[in-house]
Amino acid sequence: MARAKFERNKPHVNIGTIGHVDHGKTTLTAAITMTLAASGGAKARKYDDIDAAPEEKQRGITINTAHVEYETEQRHYAHVDCPGHADYVKNMITGAAQMDGAILVVSAADGPMPQTREHILLAKQVGVPSIVVFLNKADMVDDEELLELVELEVRELLSSYDFPGDDIPIVSGSALKALDFLTENPKTTRGENDWVDKIHALMDEVDAYIPTPERDIDKGLLDGLWEDVFSITGRGTVSTAGIERGKVKVGDTVELIGIKDTRTTTVTGAEMFQKTLEEGMAGDNVGLLLRGIQKNDVQRGMVIAKPKSITPHTKFEAEVYILKKEEGGRHTPFFKGYRPQFYVRTTDVTGTIDEFTADDGSTPEMVIPGDRINMTVQLICPIAIEQGMRFAIREGGRTVGAGVVAKILA
């Protein structure tokens, strides 16, 4: 079956929902698609369509990142519904790496919770530039003053992580009430239901507040490989990748870099949202068909790049902040030789911390939760890293630190 062509007629923006488990991220994602579907800007997606993997259903929590697309009058959006459960923050890091902005969902009934805090920190670390807040479950709060208190708390929390808390738009509503009404009245337009209007108001703020990103299309191609790799027998391997910069089209020669030896291959096909794509650009999430590459040659964390534009490395210096116990970090100090996981882009790689230096040049015996420190890291396998790249340090399923690559050593 011939695939429809992907039309690029509006600015394209990647956004996602972040926030604490059960605060309503997936319900809101479904409500947005149903609201915009009424005016032809989306294919309506039910909650169950978005929250689709079998293991998610049993536990009622989202594990992998679901991608949906929709349009407002202004822009075309790709939306990732990021996982909210603590075990899966790792996936949030891979989902959030591609976001130009995020909708932070906070339950008005509960206020900010531990994962709200962790997601804001991670959004800062992976470089999500703008956040708009949706105070969900407002139907469960009768007291207007209570709503204002929660709003104030959210603003203070955002400010504490260097987001402009005072300026960030906050819209309150109920994703579930909007979704229930739309399920019964799918053609509801603006002005016909208060709860649905709140979803329109949210998207107005997203349109206005989250800037259209300036894409790095003129730099050499760099695709971060993430999510799925699958084989189409006879044609090669399709790799899903988020294009960080540059552009890619069928026929381009590219290198597959990181984890294993560098391989050179040719792009023989490209698609996005199940439509064929003439040219992928920075900001797109694309499926690329690679000639002569087997499924087991490719894994998450590799990058696809213009030949000779980036090299894999195993040793670097980094500026790192180690989370305090109250922020969900370690309870105890660590010493030289500590071996956590380093999450770079979409890769988790074990590395050893060889040495550390404080701001004043001294070399402390140990690093205490809450310290900011310069450290030297030796990874167990090479990955494509560059100066200025951000990463998270994880241990036993939780984020214990966040940092930025200061200098490549080897």
Curated annotation (Swiss-Prot):
Gene3D superfamilies, per database record: P-loop containing nucleotide triphosphate hydrolases, Translation factors
Matching SUPFAM superfamilies: EF-Tu/eEF-1alpha/eIF2-gamma C-terminal domain, P-loop containing nucleoside triphosphate hydrolases, Translation proteins
GO molecular function: GTP binding; GTPase activity; translation elongation factor activity
Annotated stretches, region: G3: 81-84
GO cellular component: cytosol
Region (G5): 174-176
EC number: 3.6.5.3
Chain positions recorded as Mg(2+) binding sites: T26
Name of the protein in question: Elongation factor Tu
Organism: Arthrospira platensis
Gene name for this UniProt entry: tuf
